Amino acid sequence: MTIFIDLASLEDLYNDLISHIETLRKKKGSEYSVADYQILIGEQRTVEFLSKIVSNETEFLFKECKDSDKDIEGFFNVILTILHKLENEDEINIVSQKIRDSLSAHPTENSQLKIKILTNLFNSFQPKSTQRYDIFFALVKLASDSNNLEFVKYQITDIDSWLEDWNVSIQQKRKLYKLISNIFKEKQRMLSHQFLVKYLQTFTKEDSQEAQEDAVRVCIESISLQELYQSDYLLDLPAVQYLEGSTVSANSLTYELMKIFATEQLDSFLQFQQKNPNFLSTIGLSNDDCLQKIRLLSLATLTSEQSKVPYSLISKMLQIDENEVEMWVINAMEGDLLDAKLDQLNRIVNVNSSTQRVFNKSQWSQLGQRFSVWKSSVKNLLQVIENAKTTQVKPFYFQTR
């Protein structure tokens, strides 16, 4: 948090602010009258004074003084100092909003400085201040509109804990998550998908109908994102579950297809295709891309169930020629779906580890069995060590006279 320590009186700050603008106006040959400002100051209408001077002077500063960042930032620093002398929360919010709106009006003009000033405004409030939400939203929007995506990406790393600190409403969460998702929709699709999921997580069974368009979108994304191999988390979202029973045929089919990619195998996908031959293209999916992904997912499932997998079994499951098996295994390894070694002599894939597409009761049972085996192995090893200690030959010494 930025701490403002200013021993000047309000009257001195007002005069400094007006004098600062007056000097800049004269330098640029711009007509300027302080009468309106002085009336507001004289009547102690601080909020109106701050709102008016921010509205009137921001555009001038960024157009006529664009080569003097120091003068512009100095103006807003005085504004912030006065702002934090206000005691009424509503008044603070009015001025804060005026600053946000004025800086966001022309986002592409001197955007870096505007982002810096908004950041100063954000940091001037306590970490748990509710004011921070609206400022942060404006910051993200401004950075997006001015194509400063790396700034946005850097700022959102702690977003969930911040939202908790600010005690925001569900609607505020949705608004921010949706904004961030849309910002990265074209250029960083995985990040966009993650925030779309966060957005949909805020819906319950009662209001899921409101999110149908976005639920369809998240299902399609889970299929089209080639680097996304685990998507069973979508099955737990009420907004996505609502699609299953939708009266809109395309919505229910999208859910069915998403579920195949989340939990099922190649044969289920081929059956779906046979029943709905043109559906993939209608929702913007490539048949070849989908076929490649479902084969990789099917391979992950197969290799998660056994540690030694014959080429012939992989060939049968993926419906490919046996000579293509090694290529598919290598592709799966490059995508971090599995870690394995190819035994070309015996035509077997020796699996070290494989991605679990789902983690349900069956997987917990497998994990429990493995822990039991490890526990037994460790117990036997400890027993061997203990036996070695007790049977160890004790050294003897020759006695000398």
From Swiss-Prot:
GO terms for cellular component: eukaryotic 43S preinitiation complex; eukaryotic 48S preinitiation complex; eukaryotic translation initiation factor 3 complex; eukaryotic translation initiation factor 3 complex, eIF3m. Residues 188-356 form the PCI domain. GO terms for molecular function: translation initiation factor activity. It is found in: Cytoplasm. InterPro entries: COPS7/eIF3m (IPR045237), eIF3m (IPR027528), eIF3m_C_helix (IPR040750), PCI_dom (IPR000717), WH_DNA-bd_sf (IPR036390). Pfam families: eIF3m_C_helix (PF18005), PCI (PF01399). One of its GO terms (biological process) is formation of cytoplasmic translation initiation complex. Component of the eukaryotic translation initiation factor 3 (eIF-3) complex. This is Eukaryotic translation initiation factor 3 subunit M. It comes from Dictyostelium discoideum (Social amoeba). The lineage of its organism: Eukaryota, Amoebozoa, Evosea, Eumycetozoa, Dictyostelia. The gene is eif3m.
